[in-house]
Structures are given as structure tokens and as C-alpha cells.
Amino acid sequence: MIELFLAGALLLSSPQTPAPPVSQDPLQLEDVVVSGRTLDSLIEDFVGEVAEPNRNRGLARWHDSICVGVANLDGEIAQYLSDRISTVATDMGLRAGAPGCTPNILVIATADAGGLARQLTEERRRAFRMGGAGMDRGGSALRDFVEADRPVRWWQMSMPVDSETGDPAVRIPGRCTGDCIDAADMAPQIYIHSASRLSTQIVDNLIRTIVIVDVDEVGGLSALQLADYIAMVSLAQIDPDADTSNYASILNVFEAPEISDSLTDWDKAYLDGLYAAERNHVGERADRSEIADSIRRSHDRLREEEVAEEPVAD
């Protein structure tokens, strides 16, 4: 259990009250035996609950590499969390930063999560809101990040970029190009290579995730459960208020830790779909459709494996 490792945290955790049992067993992906529109509805409901893109933007993902930093935890557990999150990222086709890299996923443990969130957002406001259109979830969501009582809270920044060049596609206060003399130097320069109403050069890349872990509320989890939960909310834009209680997902780990020891098939299929999606389609619905297709493919594969393992009748 992870509490065995927390002795080196900035402040120690306290004993936890066991979570109440869930009213019904969450749905395992391979157990979905319905077909047609019903299966599609289950998948679409899961994606709809989980996905939380920035306003008027598509779903963002990391483009090339991630670097995980862990603060205020004992070296052994800190290294484990970093390694496990990096492993999940590499499974998605990303590169993990070498030792000494500058973290773009920062995990901070504390016994006063709300206080730390408030301090960081007040003292380093620009790290949370850079001012570019579509780069974060907005002021109301930031207040929720500070004020809501959650075992793990997270804040992400993403950047709309030109997929051809990687250059920012939005104006960012304080940044400019050229001589920085007139208004044109303050605006992004996008050269359209092929105009289309169905495709776009502008895609959304995650550029920063800040995760705050309340050590008083995670003592009942295994190190793997905590690491995979953080990986899920760091590698994708996840709605912190998502109700996934009807599905077997790592996102339910605080309400029902016995349901999953690690990322589930629902979670893996969601991430697989996000990172395999063709992102030049116009509209958020296209992103969600590709994720839903990934989950359906995983369901079909799992059902085939289950059938293959069934004993053959004499």
C-alpha cells in the first residue's frame, strides 16, 4: 500500500475511512454483450462524461514528449510514480524525458492541497492562465481547482498550434515576432497550405499539467493505482466531475478502490483513441468519434479473446 512509502512526504497522511460499496458492479468493457445502438450509446456516454476540452477547442494531447517531476515525496515512491506515468506515456507513442529534464507534468504532494493550490495560483498566476484564447478551461474552472475538495486535483494548459510548423496559433500576451513594433508582430503567422471546410491545420497540444495530491486522502491506494490515476488525468483532458461509476475505470479508484488495480480496458482504449486520432478534422465531435471507435475495437477484441478461451463442448 502506498502509505508505506509516504513517510518521506512533506506532511504525513492519516488513516482513512473505507469507501462505501458501490450499488452495482461497474461495467467491464469485455462484458458488454449488447449490440448496435445500445453499445454505441454506452461508449458515447463514457466519452462524453470523461472528455473535457477547453472551450471552443478540440481535444488536446501531448505532441512529442513528456517529462514528469514529483515533489515532496520519498525518493522511492517519487521515482515509481515518475517511471509509471512515463511508461503509460511511451505506450501512447510519446517520448519520456531523460533525468534532469524540465518537467511539463509536475506532481506535488501535500497535506494542504487547497492551500497549496491557492498559493500557487496567486503567486504564479501566469503558470495557470497564460492569456491565450483556448489555452485553459477558464476562470470558473480555476476557482474549482482551488476550492473543490478532491484527493487529486489537476490543472492543464494547452496550446493551439500550426500542425505544419508547431508555431502557436493564438496571440499570447507578452510574446511577439519580428521587431515587435506593430500589431502584426503580436499576432500568430499561419500559412494555409490547403484550404478546406473539413480539415484544419490548427491542433491542440498539451503543454503543462500540474497535479496536486492530498496525502491525507490517498493512503488507501496502492502506488500503481495512484500512478495510473495521475497518468490518466495528465495525458488527457479529463473532466474532474465526470461520473464514471457505471464503468470499470481507474477514475473511480477513490470511490471504489477494489474495482481496478490499474488502468482498465476502458481507460486504455480511451487513451489509445486519443493518441491515434487524426487531429486535422474540423470539430470536437471528430475527436470524440475516433476515441469511441477505439473503444469499440477494444471491446470487439476482448470479446473475441473471451470466446476463444471458452471450453469447446463435446
Label every model-predicted segment.
Residues 11-28:
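Cleaved targeting-peptide boundary
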Residues 30-31, 62-68, 209:
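Hydrophobic beta-strand segments of well-ordered beta-sheets in folded domains
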Residues 2, 37-38:
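Short coil/turn linker and secondary-structure boundary residues
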